[in-house]
C-alpha cells in the first residue's frame, strides 16, 4: 500500500525522447549538398592539375618576351565635348603622311633572327593646358573592310576610360598569334611602307582608334603613338634539356 510519501512510478511519469536519432531536415539537405559540391570540386581540381606546369601572364604586355618600342608620331588634336576624334586609321594611307616620318626613330630596334610574338598599339595622351581636370576616353575596332571609310568624329557611346599613365594599349595579335618572320631589320630598312603592309598587316589586325575626354569644354590633347613589338627571346632562362652540353 502506497502512502502519500511513497514513490508511485505510475504517478507523474514523464517521457524523454533521445534526440540523437532525430535531425533537422534542412541540415540534412545542406550537408548532402555540401558533400556533393566537395566531390565535384575535387574532380574539377584533378582535371586542372596538368595546367599547373604552365605560367600565364595576367597582362600579355608584361608576359615573357622583350618589348621594343617604335615611335610613329606625336601631334596635337583638338577634341570637342561629347565627341570622340579619329586618331588612327590603318585602313587608309594615313601611315604615309609626313608627320609620321618626322618623328620616326632612325634605327629599328629589332635585330636579325628574332620573332614577333605580339604587336601593341600604344597611345599616350597628355593635356597641353595646365591645371585641367578630366579623364581620357578611347574606343577602338580591330577589323574592317579595306574600302571602309570611318567618320572623323563620332558621339561618345560606351567608351573606355584610359587607365594608368594616360596610356591606351591595344593588342593587335590575331588568334593563334605570332609572326614568324626573320630578318626584320632588313625588311624594315628596305621599305617602311612594305614592312607595314607585308609583315605587320599580314599577321596582325589593323586598328581604328577614337579618343576623347569627359570634359565639358574643348580640350587640346598631345598624342604620342607608337608600336611596341613583343619579341621572342631565343635564349630561355632555363635550359630545355639536361645534359653535358648544358
Curated annotation (Swiss-Prot):
Pfam families: Polyhedrin (PF00738). One of its GO terms (molecular function) is structural molecule activity. The gene is PH. It comes from the Viruses. Keywords: Viral occlusion body. It comes from Spodoptera frugiperda nuclear polyhedrosis virus (SfNPV). Belongs to the polyhedrin family. This is Polyhedrin. One of its GO terms (cellular component) is viral occlusion body. Major component of the virus occlusion bodies, which are large proteinaceous structures (polyhedra), that protect the virus from the outside environment for extended periods until they are ingested by insect larvae.
Amino acid at each position: 500500500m502506497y502512502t502519500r510519501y511513497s514513490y508511485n512510478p505510475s504517478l507523474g511519469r514523464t517521457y524523454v525522447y533521445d534526440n540523437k536519432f532525430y535531425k533537422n531536415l534542412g541540415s540534412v539537405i545542406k550537408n548532402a549538398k555540401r558533400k556533393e559540391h566537395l566531390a565535384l570540386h575535387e574532380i574539377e581540381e584533378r582535371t586542372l592539375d596538368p595546367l599547373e606546369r604552365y605560367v600565364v601572364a595576367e597582362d600579355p604586355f608584361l608576359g615573357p618576351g622583350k618589348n621594343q618600342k617604335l615611335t610613329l608620331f606625336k601631334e596635337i588634336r583638338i577634341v570637342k565635348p561629347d565627341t570622340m576624334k579619329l586618331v588612327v586609321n590603318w585602313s587608309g594611307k594615313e601611315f604615309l603622311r609626313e608627320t609620321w616620318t618626322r618623328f620616326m626613330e632612325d634605327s629599328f630596334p629589332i635585330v636579325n633572327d628574332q620573332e614577333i610574338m605580339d604587336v601593341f598599339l600604344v597611345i599616350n595622351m597628355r593635356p597641353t593646358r595646365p591645371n585641367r581636370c578630366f579623364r581620357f576616353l578611347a574606343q577602338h575596332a580591330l577589323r574592317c573592310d579595306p574600302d571602309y571609310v570611318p567618320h572623323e568624329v563620332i558621339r561618345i557611346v560606351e567608351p573606355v576610360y584610359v587607365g594608368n599613365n594616360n596610356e591606351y594599349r591595344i593588342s593587335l595579335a590575331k588568334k593563334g598569334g605570332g609572326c614568324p618572320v626573320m630578318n626584320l631589320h632588313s625588311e624594315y630598312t628596305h621599305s617602311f611602307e612594305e614592312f607595314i603592309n607585308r609583315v605587320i598587316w599580314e599577321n596582325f589586325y589593323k586598328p581604328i582608334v577614337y579618343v576623347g575626354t569627359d570634359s565639358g569644354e574643348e580640350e587640346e590633347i598631345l598624342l604620342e603613338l607608337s608600336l611596341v613589338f613583343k619579341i621572342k627571346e631565343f635564349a630561355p632562362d632555363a635550359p630545355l634539356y639536361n645534359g653535358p652540353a648544358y
